[in-house]
């Protein structure tokens, strides 16, 4: 199992839908979140992409020298940058980070943003571009000089003279809920990602992608993207969930849902359908809450509960075949610690062993010394 955290390059705070309790995006703050995730033992961090975020490649380049083990899941956008240039960027960042780069392939689901970025293609055509892009990108990073003449991409003698540290290339992560996305995942990517839908829906996605991968003689791993609200008791967790959205007005929800309605993303449509823009139908399965999606695009669901409940729900997704979990919580600095302290002890290794110690304090006392010479008692001792 690989547990990731999230870098809030689009802003952070205690509440959704308001500037109250908000924090600006800054390098010092992102450094705090990244170094916390690094020292706590998270496998990596997802860096979001799009016009509402700081650029993910620049952020990863700034933070890689400030961390030691943390991996960075960074987006590539087929159609915006050529596959050859993108491959060289990936090779460089992978080398300079010591092999800590992971690639998130994003086709883009907002037609308005796509047009602003110079992409005037429909849903099906964007997946054609992504397919051709990855065919070139993968071969270039494997050291080939590539000639490719596709419907959308045409390159001659495309090459990267400096190889990536990870071979054959940094692992490819990719999410999408349409048939075209599943076919692409089955043929070309290493890890298929889904947003946090109910268990039956996730199981169906996994089965479909597995079947498509098998037809290509491949196997694919699976990951899920979720928010998390965990507290010592379930009652505290649900109160925290209510507080997270207490400042959101009905007008704000309506405006957000209207914006999401223009998307041609099947995944975004499925996220919106989980709550229907209503506050009174947010727990969509035990401990799975759709409140974040009232105003946030993309991942819109959270695991809510006490540590045992959250760990049990994680275990249920793991039983389906999920082995990469990408979590986030508001505010991201505090919640990175809270999740590690409360849930890591209940997860498989290496996380259970990291709990209560962290990667930077494996042998020393954990907690404040008592009366100048007494070690703090270990919980459960």
Curated annotation (Swiss-Prot):
Induction per the UniProt record: Repressed by sulfate, cysteine, or thiocyanate.
Domain of life: Bacteria
Catalytic activity: an alkanesulfonate + FMNH2 + O2 = an aldehyde + FMN + sulfite + H2O + 2 H(+)
Uppermost EC category: oxidoreductase
SUPFAM superfamilies named in the record: Bacterial luciferase-like
Claim: Acyltransferase is one of the keywords in the record: no
Entry-linked CDD domains: Alkanesulfonate_monoxygenase
A single GO BP: alkanesulfonate catabolic process
Role this protein plays: Catalyzes the desulfonation of aliphatic sulfonates. Shows highest activity with methanesulfonate.
Additional observations: FMNH(2) which is absolutely required for this enzymatic reaction, is provided by MsuE.
Name listed for the protein in its UniProt record: Methanesulfonate monooxygenase
